[in-house]
């Protein structure tokens, strides 16, 4: 969805643990109540400053996991887009960084799937908006529309690292985790409403 899915996950994790962070776009640091939990990422990665920021975030994320903390990651680094109003929304290609981090820290993984999609106008314009301010304004607009509405999420079972250790290739591990996550869509038993 863009913002509200991250807020829901932070809220859920905070009920049982305080040692968590969420990797998200640096512009979301404006959410002051979440600032201490945000590991900022600059997805443009074009400038020296953005590269420096991303390296610092990667180091902090690795340290968090090595210390047994929880890291919330949206592996595509973006918002799922539907090709048309009748289609489901799907992620862009998943980044390989989460797979690298999993292998480096030998961490377990909990897949979570959010059911639903943003409004029609969002999907019509999402791929066309180049201006970052307009793009993030559209995320805020979608978030406001969802306040007070039901959002269904599917929470999978923890995948122990020993079960995925043999998937040495980052591509292979990423594909496996993506498949496991999208399978959750059909797992009604573990469906939660927030």
Regions found by a protein language model. Give the residues of each.
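Catalytic core of membrane glycerolipid acyltransferases/transacylases, capturing the structured
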Residues: 1-50
